[in-house]
Design a protein with these regions (language model features):
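FAD-binding core/adjacent interface of flavoenzyme oxidoreductases
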Residues: 1-11, 69-144, 216
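Beta1-alpha1 glycine-rich phosphate/pyrophosphate-binding loop at the start
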Residues: 2-72, 154-182
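A conserved FAD-binding loop/helix module that cradles the flavin
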Residues: 243, 261-314
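C-terminal auxiliary extensions adjacent to catalytic cores
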Residues: 315-359
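A Rossmann-like FAD-binding core segment of flavoenzymes
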Residues: 74-82, 97, 162-245, 299
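Rossmann-like NAD(P)H-binding beta-loop-alpha module
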Residues: 131, 135-166
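FAD-site-proximal beta/loop scaffold in flavoenzymes
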Residues: 117-140, 209-281
């Protein structure tokens, strides 16, 4: 249990309890008086959402199990506004929460056409995996995954393995696995054939163009930065929050930004992609920088490079794509059951790292 005495000026609000926000809160709590604002009572392993769609029972952990030892408070509410002049955050229960330093960690969401719905209720995303699971239980039919990135590939593979009665297909505007090497893409295509997944590459599609009983949209992610925009924070053209090397908003240096909402970059990696693999290091660095700032020390710039991309292709197959520091694929992969086990270990390590930070 943390017993240190907090001092004036160390109130830190963390908006969002995903990978980046939770890690930032745990690191900052070594020196700061930390409050996490998130409507959920549980931390959810977002990288396992495709497993939920295929029937996994639970991917959540009580937030209290991470926060209690470091005396981090949790406000179960949704952020509606940030007032950077008064240094307050407003939540949907109309409460105002003052801060000295703020961590913006509201993540991202799947970007769909229009309001993301269809009149006939056919459209689902990774975020609605539990509802998708219920729909699949209603009976067999046809299901199309839109988007050939890692999220779509994992979703299609997992469902095809678990739901043999359903006819699974994928439609993607470009090549499947655009971030993979040719060897990696070949393995994905071979796996799809083995699982009976029909693949159509080079076809842009809208939901109304698809004749399927169920559509799972995984085509792109969008940062949840609308609240930041309303508060006047500087954003990039693609809607992420501009940050400096220390992960502070370039327009509001008392606001740190982590996770998918941050347009963070390093010399080695370039601009970081939206991923759990980047969210945890961002959260850790922001939290440590807050501690340094409160101790009167100089915050340090983010240091980050890529090593590999890991992908599950069902429970018994996977793909490890080795990459350079800048995330460009090398001509080296690991496949099969060994890759599936490595993927599982990587996923488990994310929760382990949070547990270690919570001690």
């Amino acid at each position: 249990m943390t017993n240190k005495r907090k001092t004036a000026g160390d109130r830190v609000l963390v908006l969002g309890a995903g990978y980046g926000g939770l890690m930032a809160a745990l690191r900052a709590a070594d020196e700061a008086d930390v409050t996490v604002i998130d409507p959920a009572a549980h931390f959810s392993e977002r990288v396992r959402e495709h497993e939920v769609a295929a029937g996994r029972d639970d991917i959540s952990h009580p937030l209290s199990s991470f926060l209690e030892k470091k005396r981090i408070r949790h406000v179960a509410a949704r952020v509606t506004d940030i007032d950077p002049v008064r240094k307050e955050v407003v939540t949907d229960d109309r409460r105002r929460h003052p801060y000295d330093l703020l961590v913006y960690a509201l993540g991202s969401r799947t970007q769909t056409f229009g309001d993301g719905s269809t009149e006939d209720g056919r459209l689902f995303t990774s975020e609605t995996a539990r509802y998708l699971r219920k729909r699949l239980d209603d009976g067999p039919g046809t299901l199309t995954v839109v988007g050939g990135g890692a999220t779509g590939v994992e979703m299609a593979s997992e469902l095809a393995e678990a739901e043999r009665a359903w006819k699974i297909s994928m439609v993607t505007a470009g090549e499947v696995g655009p971030a993979l090497s040719e060897k990696g893409r070949t393995h994905v295509r071979s796996t799809f054939r083995d699982l009976g997944i029909s693949l159509e590459e080079g076809r842009p599609a809208a939901p109304e163009d698809l004749d399927a009983d169920v559509i799972v949209w995984t085509a792109s992610l969008r940062a949840n930065a609308e609240i930041a925009r309303s508060a006047g924070l500087a954003l990039t053209v693609d809607g992420r929050i501009q940050v400096d090397a220390m992960l502070r908003s370039v327009s509001h240096p008392d606001i740190y930004v982590v996770g998918d909402a941050a347009a963070a970059r390093t010399a080695a990696a370039g601009e970081l992609r939206m991923a759990c693999a980047t969210a945890l290091p961002l959260g850790s660095r922001a939290g440590r920088n807050i501690v340094a700032e409160l101790r009167g020390k100089r915050p340090k710039p983010l240091s980050f490079r890529y090593y590999a991309q890991v992908m599950s292709l069902g429970r018994r197959n996977g793909l490890v794509q080795f990459v350079g520091a800048d995330d460009k694929p090398k001509d080296l992969i690991v496949t099969g059951r060994k890759a599936a086990l490595l993927k599982e270990q990587v996923v488990r390590s994310t929760v382990r790292s949070l547990r270690l930070a919570a001690r």
